[in-house]
């Protein structure tokens, strides 16, 4: 079976890519097509929606953080037993950072690398024929990135659709569908993006409504034929992050949700066993595990409950006496001494590290990061370089007394200083690791 693939891109965030992608995934799945979803860039939330829409795990591909051979390997894995791959772009299609060619982090990099056409989603609210100038720009901006077709989104009426369609088709781009404006299709959001699929109270009915809208509005047969057959080498896992232990105690509940699908998949494929536990249910890490991993998530929304989880706190403290504990972002916040929530209430955390964080005065920290590990750790040896990102609103209000976990640089290599902390067997940082550097 040869899979076909197409990238779903747009001029900017907020154009409706996610709703269109989720709806198309479910619509094709309902037709019996073996369809899979991929999200470009560092995004934990959208792959969860892709998984709910298809019943199969999602995946992230990031051309800045992942070396080309790792991209090929992960993409090849996702195409196994699949007929159609829909790749949802982050932000605008060409948006990335100004670094080496095809390593910018943009979805356009993947279009070039994999020779995949783009389905351009245009939010035409507030315009009509002018949408054709945007489509024209996309069609001619980069000769190595092919615009396969256009989908109009948030049109106000059939007349509005006709005006936009006629103008765009005059420049030689087919319009394969038009989704009319419908507030009921909007997905709820919060400070780190969309409310996660697992927390959406009516997720399946909502995805079905999106699928109904796509079935009604988009020519699915034409879209399938526009997707390009995938034919590429299998790549390599050399740049993948190795399992941090043989048995990994993984915090997994509404407060700890951000573990990239490719990491979980690779760790299991490498022979590691993941043993989940729930701090919110006052569960401690299994003492038979080799390492405890606290991923990112939303501990600030559950700070009071975590502070009261005496069994969890005692268990992880006992675990950390002899075995490694690592926390990323939200997990790092919980490893500190205290966490101040949005209302200014201070909650005692585990105290395994000495810092304190606050969500009361929010400041967005966002961007690609290169982390040089300061000392041997579960993520690598001293001097090893990892690529990943930060995305959080919390601030460190007391840096504590611990040694840094890593020395950080931004996506262009500019130094940002020390990051995180380490003490004994415990380490943590706001940095989310994606892959080995290089």
Swiss-Prot record:
It catalyses: hydrogenobyrinate + 2 L-glutamine + 2 ATP + 2 H2O = hydrogenobyrinate a,c-diamide + 2 L-glutamate + 2 ADP + 2 phosphate + 2 H(+). The active site is at 329 (nucleophile). Its cofactor is Mg(2+). Its EC number is 6.3.5.9. It comes from the Bacteria. PANTHER family: COBYRINATE A,C-DIAMIDE SYNTHASE. This is Hydrogenobyrinate a,c-diamide synthase. It comes from Agrobacterium fabrum (strain C58 / ATCC 33970). The gene is cobB.
């Amino acid at each position: 079976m040869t899979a076909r693939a197409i990238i779903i891109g747009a001029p900017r965030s907020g154009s409706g890519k996610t709703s269109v992608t989720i709806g198309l995934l479910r619509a094709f799945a309902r037709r019996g097509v073996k369809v899979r979803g991929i999200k470009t860039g560092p995004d934990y939330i959208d792959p969860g929606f892709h998984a709910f829409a298809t019943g199969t795990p999602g995946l992230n591909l990031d051309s800045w953080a992942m070396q080309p051979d790792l991209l090929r390997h992960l993409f090849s894995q996702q195409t196994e037993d699949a007929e159609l791959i829909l790749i949802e772009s982050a932000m605008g299609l060409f948006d990335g950072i100004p670094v080496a060619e095809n390593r910018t982090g943009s979805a356009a990099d993947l279009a070039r690398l994999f020779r995949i056409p783009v389905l351009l989603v245009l939010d035409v609210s507030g315009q009509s024929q002018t949408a054709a100038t945007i489509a024209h720009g996309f069609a001619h901006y980069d000769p190595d990135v092919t615009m396969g077709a256009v989908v109009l989104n948030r049109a106000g009426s059939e007349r509005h659709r006709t005006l936009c369609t006629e103008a765009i088709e005059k420049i030689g781009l087919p319009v394969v569908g038009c989704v009319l404006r419908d507030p009921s299709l909007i997905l709820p959001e919060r400070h780190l993006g969309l409310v996660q699929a697992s927390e959406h109270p009516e997720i399946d009915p909502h995805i079905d409504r999106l699928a109904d809208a796509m079935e009604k509005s988009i020519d699915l047969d034409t879209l399938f034929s526009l997707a390009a057959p995938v034919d590429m080498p299998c790549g390599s896992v050399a740049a993948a992050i190795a399992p941090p232990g043989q048995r990994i105690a993984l915090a997994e509940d509404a407060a700890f949700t951000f573990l990239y699908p490719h990491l979980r998949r690779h760790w299991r494929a490498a022979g590691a066993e993941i043993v989940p536990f729930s701090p919110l249910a006052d569960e401690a890490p299994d003492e038979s595990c080799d390492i405890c991993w606290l991923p990112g998530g939303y501990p600030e929304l559950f700070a009071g409950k975590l502070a009261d989880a005496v069994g969890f706190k005692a268990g992880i403290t006992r675990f950390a006496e002899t075995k490694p504990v690592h926390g990323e972002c939200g997990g790092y916040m919980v490893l500190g001494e205290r966490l101040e929530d949005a209302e200014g209430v201070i909650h005692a955390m585990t105290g395994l590290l000495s810092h304190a964080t606050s969500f009361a005065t929010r400041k967005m920290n966002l961007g690609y990061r290169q982390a040089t590990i300061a000392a041997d750790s579960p993520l690598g040896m001293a001097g090893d370089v990892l690529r990943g990102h930060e995305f959080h609103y919390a601030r460190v209000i007391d840096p504590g007394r611990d040694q840094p976990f890593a020395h950080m640089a931004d996506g262009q290599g500019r130094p940002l200083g020390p990051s995180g902390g380490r003490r004994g067997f415990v380490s943590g940082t706001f940095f989310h690791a994606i892959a080995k550097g290089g």
